Every structure is written in C-alpha cells, then in structure tokens.
C-alpha cells in the first residue's frame, strides 16, 4: 500500500509529533540521518500519505500531523519499543515486590506509578466479577454478638460482610444458614448465585431458618455489590485536564461523570494483544481527541483483566506500550500468586 520510504516518513512524523506536539514539515524530516532525501521527494511522499488518509495538513502550518488512520497503521505495523523504558522497570518491580501489603494496595500503587511516568490517566479492570466462581462461603465469629461472613472466589477476590446477632438469634443457627448457602452456591458464578437465591429449591432449603434468612441473604447481596468496586481501579484522572484537548469545561465535566459511572469499562478492549480506540470509535465528546490504549493480562484459561491508559492521540506509543505490557505481566502474576494462597 505504501512504500518503505513512506513508512519511514510516517513513523518519523508520528514520533516527532508525539514528542513536540507540533506539525512536522519536510525540513524537520531532512534533519534525520535515515531520511536524507531532497525536500521535493519528502514533500511528494507526505502528499501521498495525506491523500491516502494517513496524514492531515494543518491550515496554520505547512507541516503535517498524523490522522487516526495513520496512528492505527503505526501501531499495527511500525511502532517499536523504546529500550530506554526498561530503565524504569526496577521501579515497577519494587511496587510488585510489596504484594504482602495486599493486592488492592499493589494495583493502586502500580497505577499511580504508571500515571507518574506517563502523565496520562490509568485504568485497571480486574477479572469479570460476575463470571468469578464462588470458592467458599464461611463465617468467622467475632465475640458473642457479631460475626463476619466471608465470600472467596476462584479469582482470589475476598469480600466480607459483618453480621450482628440479635438476642433472638443463635450463633449456631447463623453458622447453619451460611453452611447451607455454601452448599447451594459453591462453584457457581456470582451472577448465577443471585439467580439461585430466587429459585424455589433454594428458598425451601433456607425456609427452616426463616428468622435469619432475610438478613443473611441481604448480607450476601451487600457483599456482592462490593465485589464490583474491587475490580475497578483508576489513577491520575486530573492528568487528562492538563491536556489541551480538555480546554472545554463541559468536556471536562462529562469526562469526570464518565469515570464516576465507570462507563470507561465498556470502552476498554478485551481482545488479545494491544487494543487502541480513538475518538471516532467512541462517539463520546470528551474523548473526541483522546485515545484509549489497553492490554489484557491473562490469569488463567477463563479469567483475564485489562490495564489501559487514556491520553491524547499523540501519546508516545513507543514508550507507553512497553510500560503497559510490563505492568500487565506483573498484574497477571499478582493474581495467579494470590489465587494459590486463597
């Protein structure tokens, strides 16, 4: 489709535009040792790339900037990994070496480091919580009048819900209800578990504990609702507002609302390998000139999560991609190690 020389020119323009944020002209390209061609040759190839839709011409400048199509081609065929990025890998290793502080803490610290290194907004989405399977449900007494119900999933999620035991309730009966729930719901997905609790046979199993049934089921549902918040992590949201793409206050407000409602989760790719979504893909005004680049991390044959960056389309992909890949690999290991321990 395009010649080898035109590929070099396209890559050079995108790399230079990512670094400086200014349109690139033939004079700047001629300064590169591997593009030692005449100005006329470079201008001709730039015009061809523009005609093919890989470049756009700015009205205020004779230089060109990449189009979305140009970025797509670059990411799919031309991008190289910046070897200098490996210099910060020890910082990432240090974050994940402190996993004893808890998975949630480690993920938050990893995202914070990622936003510090890139100045973009970072998002991590854990395994699809609705498809996690219940590994066990158990009760831990806390004195005479309180207990904690623990729900553990096969993906390493642990959620707890405190239960207060009133005077008309017995600890042994509470244990029996939770034991019955464990028998009913073990090895089911969380999504299925909610459906099972509404089915007749589940209700009949619990009817013998009528005075406790409602409270325990309510506690289970409350614990379930907490799982969703545990699988979504966000860092550096205000970094987006430093970008000129967010000069419009209404776009800024919509972006905040979108993050609060977690609409971003629907936009993050779940396919294998690198997924890139540009503004035109998303039809959301705050993201018109933004890009979401995401990479999945595989936990096992069924479970995977995703880590993503939200930034301007002109972000430095050759630096961002290896960072995302390295953190994704560490996240996969973190989940796997956690699963072995639960």
Swiss-Prot record:
Pfam family, one: HrcA
Keyword Repressor: yes
Keyword Acyltransferase: no
Transmembrane segments: none
Any one biological process term the GO annotation gives: negative regulation of DNA-templated transcription
Record keywords: Repressor, Stress response, Transcription, Transcription regulation
Signal peptide range: none
Domain of life: Bacteria
InterPro entries: GAF-like_dom_sf, HrcA, HrcA_C, WH-like_DNA-bd_sf, WH_DNA-bd_sf, WHTH_transcript_rep_HrcA_IDD
GO molecular function: DNA binding
Family: Belongs to the HrcA family.
NCBIfam families membership: hrcA
Role, per record: Negative regulator of class I heat shock genes (grpE-dnaK-dnaJ and groELS operons). Prevents heat-shock induction of these operons.
Protein name: Heat-inducible transcription repressor HrcA
């Amino acid at each position: 489709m395009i010649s080898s020389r035109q590929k070099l020119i396209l890559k050079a323009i995108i790399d230079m535009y990512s670094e400086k944020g200014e349109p690139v002209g033939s004079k700047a390209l001629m300064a590169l040792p591997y593009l030692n061609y005449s100005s006329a040759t470079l201008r001709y190839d730039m015009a061809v790339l523009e005609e093919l839709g890989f470049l756009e011409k700015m009205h205020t400048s004779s230089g060109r900037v990449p189009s979305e199509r140009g970025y797509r081609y670059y990411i799919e065929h031309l991008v190289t990994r910046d070897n200098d990025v490996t210099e910060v890998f020890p910082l990432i290793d240090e974050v994940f070496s402190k996993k004893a502080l808890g998975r949630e803490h480690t993920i938050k610290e990893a995202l914070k480091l990622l936003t510090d290194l890139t100045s973009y907004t970072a998002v991590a989405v854990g395994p699809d919580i609705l498809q996690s399977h219940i590994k066990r449900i158990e009760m831990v007494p806390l004195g005479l009048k309180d207990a904690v119900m623990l729900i553990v999933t096969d993906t390493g999620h642990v959620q707890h819900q405190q239960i207060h035991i009133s005077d008309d309730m017995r600890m042994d009966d509470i244990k029996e209800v939770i034991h019955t729930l464990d028998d009913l719901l073990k090895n089911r997905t969380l999504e299925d578990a909610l459906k099972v609790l509404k089915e007749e046979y589940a209700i009949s199993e619990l009817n013998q504990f009528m005075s406790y049934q409602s409270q325990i089921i309510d506690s289970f549902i409350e614990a379930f609702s907490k799982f969703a918040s545990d699988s979504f992590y966000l860092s550096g949201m205000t970094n987006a507002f430093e970008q000129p793409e967010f000069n419009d206050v209404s776009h800024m407000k919509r972006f905040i609302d979108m993050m609060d409602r977690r609409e971003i989760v629907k936009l993050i790719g779940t396919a294998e390998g690198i997924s890139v979504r540009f503004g035109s893909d998303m039809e959301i005004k705050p993201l018109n000139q933004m890009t979401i680049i995401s990479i999945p991390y595989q936990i096992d044959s069924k479970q995977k999560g995703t880590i993503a960056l939200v930034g301007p389309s002109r972000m430095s992909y050759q630096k961002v991609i290896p960072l995302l890949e390295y953190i994704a690999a560490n996240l996969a290991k973190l989940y796997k190690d956690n699963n072995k321990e639960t």
